[in-house]
């Protein structure tokens, strides 16, 4: 089965990353949210759990980013990552209620295409929601190519000054 072959090579890659100095591993599954619930065990939960379990045997923490997954709580209960990375389609206030492990991300990168006032308001909203929860500030997906670098600099300042 092709998934087993991919999983085998991912474990080799993870081990090589750790041997080269990686102190944490992040597993991205950018297509997790596109699957029907009946396919999640076979294509998401089982292989991802195997990778997380393997990485933890090497004493390295794991961040998982199942973009678009509908039920983050169930995902965390099954996969047991050390940190869960959320996308911008999920309600951060609900995540704080449902998830006890550290959370990373969530803010929509589109906000960086607006103005400083909107950016500050949205960044502070995330910071306020997660103020009593272990949180790594990050976007809910990558920086868009048309983003003005000065807006990224401003965002970093907002977070550092919080």
Give the residues covered by each predicted segment.
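Active-site loop segments of alpha/beta catalytic cores
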Residues: 1-162
